[in-house]
Each structure stands twice: as structure tokens, then as C-alpha cells.
Regions:
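C-terminal lobe and pocket-closing loops
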Residues: 215-293, 338-360
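Secondary-structure end/capping motifs
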Residues: 265-330
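N-terminal (or domain-start) structured segment
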Residues: 33-122, 170, 183-209, 218, ...
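Hinge/capping helix and adjacent helix->loop/strand transition within the periplasmic-binding protein
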Residues: 65, 89-98, 111-195, 261-294
Length: 360
């Protein structure tokens, strides 16, 4: 499946932000420090475990950027606290364009969960690299034949569900689902979607809740069975048809499609010439046939946005999640304490007085 997203009124009302496909002309400056950049390898610190969606797409996209940048990009994983550890590490590095962050959903979870005080749309220049789908999977011999069976089981006991971290994207989706269905799950957090899938395969939990891209190799091999995807219509991938969650919980329709974004972030204080060079390489990387194949193989889709769109999307995503987490009782910090409006008031609020675009 291919999908390209853009922020519009329909998705705003669904509390789901996205990015369009606009681009800005960018030219590399020939004078000053940026003219010699990059003069050494760039380090990409990925905030989730090896093998998960953030890892796969960030590594793949970084490889596609090496040619346009004429640089070597060295990727390493620093999982924990839904990328807060990697975020803190990169923010403490010099803002010289040599330290990048690989994360998901523009770090929208960190402030509402009290993991980090940094403001995503003030600290980072974001470069979205992929969009992903949410799904639930079980071992082939699981007694849960459909998602209806899971819901029925929760009437007797909380079903154990793995996800990529407390306060992360899949935890958010599970919270929305649980509240709409009036059930409770017993959540077991892991440091990424890949470990969350392995937990189900090894019998540590009953259901894996994560991205379809993190399940796909096991679905292909028949080692995992999909129960549903967070969509409003059936989804077909390589001849496999996945049922929409609305078939079992119609109340979540306003939140569909519920999905995640994978992004690379660069310190916003980096020289503008360097940020422009990175953005130019970003646009070129999306033309890579190799990266297109990575998207296809891992059930991802393109999410291209220009710098101004990315700033707005990062703020909107944080605003929506802070509101949802408060409603679900997950938030550690109230949205009002973060200076965030209610989602329905976002368009009037944006841009706030202290917002300063870095690239225009």
C-alpha cells in the first residue's frame, strides 16, 4: 500500500496530523564554515532498539542521504524512555550538524510524559522519513482467533499486551482503543517495536501491539498472525488481508487511520547553511530506488514535508497527544502547564508568539 499524507481539516478533526508534499528551493552556500561541511562522519543516534521501525527507516534513509551529502553517516542505537535518552544525548552535542537524532512522531510524547523538558518544535529541525501503520498480532496457535476474542477475554482478566514503551505511539493507540471499548489491558513495555514483537513470539505476552512494519517479516513467515489494524477499512499487503479495528470497536472510527511517523531531527541551532544542505539532501534521498524498496518491504509510506510544515506538524502532534494522554489518564504533565492549546483551538494558536521559523 502507498500513502502520502497532508494536514487537512478532516485529519485535524480526527486528531491525526500529517504532512503534505511541498518543497522549497534550497541552495548550498559557498562561503563560511558550511562550505566545508561535512568534513567528518555524521552520527545518527536512534532512540529505539535495533530492528524496529525507527531503526529500519532511519538507517535506510540515512544511507540514501550519504550520496547527496557526500558524507558518511554512522548510525547507532540508544533505546529507552521513548527516545528521551537519545534526545538528551544529541541535545548535549555541539549544534554543528554532525549529531542527528532518529526518533518517531516528532518526540511528541516526551513533555506530556515528563521524560524531557525540551520543546520538539523549538529544539529540532525535523525531516520526516516514513509513515507507518498500527496493528495487533499473536502467535499462530493463540486462542485469540479474532480481535473479538481479545475483547471477550478482557471481561475476565486484563490481557497482556506488549508495546514500544510507556507513553509511546502504540501505547497511545492502545489507550484510545481500551477507553473506547471499555476494557483494560496489562501493558508490558519494551525498548522498541521489534522487542515487543519478539515478546509475543516467545510467549512473554499474549498480544503484540506495534507497527505492521515491525510484524511483517513474521507475518510473511507464518510465525505471527494479525488480528487487526488501526484502520477503518481492510488492509491488504502481499495477499494478506488485515481486518480494520472498527469492525470490532466502531467507537474508534474518529481516530482512524491511526499511524506513526519516523523522523530524523537536527539541532535547530545548527548553522542555517548546514540545515539547508541537509534539507536538499533529504529531498534527493526520497528519490532513491533503494529507499523506495525499503518502504515497500517494510510496509511504510512516504511522508515528505518542507521545514515550515514539519514545524507545524510537530507542534500539532504534541498538542493532540498531550490532550489525549490527559483524557486517558496517562499524562504526567497537564497540557496547560506545557503552554499547549486544545486540539480544536490549534489553528487559532499557531504560530505562537515565541515561534521562530529556522528555514523559510
Amino acid at each position: 500500500m502507498k500513502r502520502t499524507r497532508g494536514i487537512d481539516r478532516r485529519e485535524f478533526l480526527k486528531f491525526v496530523g500529517a504532512a503534505g508534499a511541498l518543497s522549497l528551493p534550497v541552495f548550498r552556500h559557498s562561503m563560511g564554515f558550511a562550505a566545508q561541511w561535512p568534513a567528518k562522519p555524521i552520527r545518527l543516534s536512534i532512540g529505539y532498539a535495533v530492528g524496529g521501525g525507527t531503526d529500519i527507516f532511519c538507517r535506510g534513509f540515512a544511507q540514501a542521504m550519504e550520496g547527496p551529502l557526500r558524507a558518511t553517516i554512522e548510525a547507532g542505537n540508544m533505546p529507552g524512555s521513548v527516545a528521551a535518552i537519545a534526545t538528551d544525548f544529541v541535545l548535549k552535542r555541539p549544534a554543528d550538524g554532525y549529531s542527528w537524532l532518529g526518533t518517531s512522531n516528532f518526540n511528541k510524547f516526551l513533555r506530556p510524559m515528563g521524560y524531557h523538558k525540551g520543546v520538539p518544535w523549538k529544539d529540532w529541525q525535523w525531516f520526516p522519513v516514513a509513515g507507518t501503520y498500527m496493528g495487533w498480532g499473536v502467535k499462530p496457535d493463540s486462542p485469540f482467533k479474532t480481535f473479538h476474542d481479545v475483547l471477550e477475554a478482557t471481561k475476565k482478566r486484563p490481557v497482556t499486551v506488549s508495546h514500544s514503551g510507556v507513553g509511546g505511539i502504540w501505547h497511545e493507540g492502545d489507550g484510545i482503543l481500551a477507553k473506547a471499548a471499555g476494557v483494560q489491558f496489562s501493558y508490558i513495555p519494551y525498548k522498541g517495536g521489534a522487542p515487543a514483537v519478539l515478546a509475543a513470539l516467545q510467549g512473554e505476552v499474549e498480544v503484540a501491539s506495534c507497527g505492521v512494519h515491525e510484524q511483517i517479516e513474521f507475518l510473511r513467515a507464518g510465525k505471527l498472525r494479525n488480528l487487526a489494524v488501526f484502520e477503518n477499512e481492510p488492509m491488504t499487503v502481499e495477499g494478506m488481508t488485515f481486518e480494520p479495528i472498527t469492525k470490532y470497536v466502531p467507537q474508534v472510527k474518529p481516530y482512524t487511520p491511526f499511524s506513526g511517523d519516523i523522523s530524523i531531527g537536527v539541532r535547530r541551532e545548527a548553522p542555517v547553511e548546514i540545515l539547508k544542505a541537509i534539507y536538499q539532501a533529504y529531498l534527493k534521498a526520497y528519490e532513491s530506488p533503494r529507499y523506495a524498496e525499503i518502504l515497500k518491504q517494510n510496509v511504510g509510506y512516504k511522508v515528505i514535508s518542507n521545514p515550515l510544515e514539519s514545524d507545524k506538524k510537530a507542534a500539532f502532534r504534541e498538542c493532540v497527544t498531550a490532550s489525549i494522554f490527559k483524557e486517558l489518564g496517562i499524562a504526567k504533565i497537564d497540557p496547560s502547564e506545557l503552554g499547549l492549546p486544545r486540539p480544536e483551538e490549534f489553528e487559532k494558536w499557531w504560530p505562537p508568539k515565541d515561534y521562530k521559523p529556522r528555514l523559510t
